[in-house]
Amino acid sequence: MKAENVKLGIAPIGWTNDDLPEIGKENTFEQCVSEMALAGFTGSEVGSKYPRDIDVLKRKLDLRGIQICNAWFSTFFVDGKKEETIKGFIEHRDFLHAMGAKVIGCSEQSRSIQGQKKAIFKEKTIFTEAEWQLLAEGYNELAKLAAEKGMKVCLHHHMGTGIQTPAEIDKYMEITNDDVYLLFDSGHLYYSEGSQQVMLEVLEKYIHRVVHVHLKDVRDEVVAEVKANDLSFLEGVVKGTFTVPGDGVIDFKPIFDILEKYDYKGWMVVEAEQDPAIANPLEYAIKGRQYIREVAGV
């Protein structure tokens, strides 16, 4: 890949999991961002331990050569909470804009089971046609609000949500305007379908609307256990569903090839939540960074 086209970031979820605060609670913000820099990354998404004071956060990140490239935002359009979602989004947008980010990654969390003790493959929600229209109207409005600051809004397809499968991604892309984008997540798509080919087909199909990329690997043996025992999303995370690129079953070279073929410009972010007491965050960050260097050439 062309080094001038892509920047490499890593998410703090490998150090502390905001969905499971007891996982990695001993790891501080300063340790987290110091180790990101030490591993060779120049970008980060935002975790719960990050200072919200813009000047303080900038100073601590600048010291380490780290930029903020995105931060998760939960939307609830299907639940009928448009007004609250829009208000929160504007505050979130302004924070990210002040930090220099260009994209805003969102997840539609209406009836999401990703944080609940429900079987991830059997109990996920399915949106009705009317609910899809609520979502489309909401995301089309978010796109306009993002554009006011020269930013782009992108949806993070995610296990346990109403937008998880390729068919659901298709529906989302079909009913939203062209200025509503996609956050492509290798791990969540592979986890959902168990297919490298399907994952690559989705990426190539929508590459012109992909503005942010999460590089997440998957351990097939853990997914098999999750399916066999009707485990929840977070139960799978604790057991090791996810890991850094090069440590699981996904072959990332075709992903990098597609991104290069279509001249993708933006961030690639390693997002690999696992128990830091088992998978040392610095060790795994270095492992993921080395794999990307070897396979993508950046």
UniProtKB/Swiss-Prot annotation:
Its cofactor is glutathione; Co(2+); Mn(2+). Keywords: Cobalt, Lyase, Manganese. Pfam families: AP_endonuc_2 (PF01261). GO terms for biological process: inositol catabolic process. GO terms for molecular function: manganese ion binding; myo-inosose-2 dehydratase activity. It catalyses: scyllo-inosose = 3D-3,5/4-trihydroxycyclohexane-1,2-dione + H2O. Disulfide bonds: none annotated. Its EC number is 4.2.1.44. The keyword Nucleotide-binding does not apply. The keyword Manganese applies. SUPFAM superfamilies: Xylose isomerase-like. It comes from the Bacteria. Belongs to the IolE/MocC family. NCBIfam families: myo_inos_iolE. This is Inosose dehydratase. The gene is iolE.
